[in-house]
Amino acid sequence: MTSEPQQFASDNYSGICPEAWAAMEEANHGHAPAYGDDLWTARASDAFRTLFETDCEVFFAFNGTAANSLALASLCQSYHSVICSDAAHVETDECGAPEFFSNGSKLLVAPSAGGKLTPEAIRAIATARSDIHFPNPRVVTV
C-alpha cells in the first residue's frame, strides 16, 4: 500500500481544520444577505479589527494569489512598481497575476541571498532611474 506524499506548496492542497469546517457548517443554516452585508462577514471583519487594534477595512479573497494580487493592486497604479527578491513568492509563483490585477505594475527583481532583501538592494533599484519611462517603485515585498 502506498500513500500520497503530503504537499506543502500551497494551502489549497489539503482540507481545512475541523474548527473552520464546524464554523462553516454552523453558517450553512438559514438565510442571510449576500455580498458581505451579513452577520458572518461583520463578525469576521470585527475580529480582524480587534486583532490588529485598528479600524480597518477587510476584504476577503478566495486564495493566496488573489489576496496578494489584489493587495498589491490596491497600492499601485499602472506606472508603479513592486520591489521584490528574486525568490519572492509574487515573482516565482503567482504566474503574472500581480501585474495583471494592478493594470501592469511591474515587479522589479533584486538579487538576494536566501530570498532576503537588503536595504542596499532596495536602494539600488529604487534610485536606479527617475525618468518617466521607469515604473516608480511604490511597494517592497518582504
Question: Which sequence ranges carry the predicted segments?
Answer:
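PLP-dependent aminotransferase-class I/II
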Residues: 102-142
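Solvent-exposed alpha-helices and their adjacent loops that cap or buttress functional pockets
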Residues: 50-53, 74-75, 90, 99-102, ...
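N-terminal amphipathic/basic leader segments beginning at the initiator methionine
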Residues: 1-23
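Conserved N-terminal alpha-helix of the aminotransferase class I/II PLP-enzyme fold
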Residues: 17-64, 86-87, 92, 97
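Structural motif
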Residues: 6-7, 56-60, 80-82, 106-107, ...
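Conserved PLP-anchoring active-site segment centered on the Schiff-base-forming lysine
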Residues: 74-92
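Conserved core of the PLP fold type I
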Residues: 56-76, 109-112
